[in-house]
Each structure stands twice: as structure tokens, then as C-alpha cells.
Amino acid sequence: MSKDNTINIEREKQLDTVKQKLAPPPMYKVLLNNDDYTPMDFVIEVLVRFFNLDSEKAHQIMLTVHYRGRAVCGVYTAEIAETKVMQVTQYAKKHQHPLMCTMEQV
């Protein structure tokens, strides 16, 4: 094998490694799930507080949760999605609501 071929193979390996390192992180949807007990106003409050939505968008998502059973609140990297789920769950428990927040890979 010539020296040029060896160098080209090494460069290709390095490029493959760089491409793997530069791949975007997996993304996760954060979802709110409907229940029969959590008030609609509380769901809107959660959406505004934890997902930085304006009240109109929060109202639309709340209605989607109510009528379709669940809705996407946002899409984040794994760590941020986990944090959002934890924050919403703790906040709901603190206010004695059974609101469920989950995450799914996109």
C-alpha cells in the first residue's frame, strides 16, 4: 500500500470521527397528559411558567390536552426535557394535582 493511500484512509477515519462528534443530540418531546381532575387554569399556568408560552398558545395546548388526551409542550435535548418533566411533576404534586408530564424521543 502506498503512503498516499494510507494517509487518505487515516483522513477518512478522522472525518468519520468528526462527523460522529458533530451529530446533533437526540431530541425529546415533553408532553402533558389529560386527567379528569387537574383544572384547565392550572394547566395553562404550568405551560406559561415552565414552557415560557404566552397565554394564547398555552390555552391552545391546554385544549389539545383536554380533547385529544395529550399534547406536546416543547422539544428539547434529553437533560432539559428531563428537567421540565421533573419541574412540572413536582409543581403539580405541590398543588395537589395529578397532572402527568412525560417525554418521548422524537
Curated annotation (Swiss-Prot):
One GO process term, biological-process aspect: protein catabolic process
A Pfam family this chain is assigned to: ClpS
Entry's family note: Belongs to the ClpS family.
Family annotation (NCBIfam families): PRK00033.1-3 (NF000670), PRK00033.1-5 (NF000672)
Function, as annotated: Involved in the modulation of the specificity of the ClpAP-mediated ATP-dependent protein degradation.
Description of how the protein assembles with itself and partners: Binds to the N-terminal domain of the chaperone ClpA.
Name of the protein: ATP-dependent Clp protease adapter protein ClpS
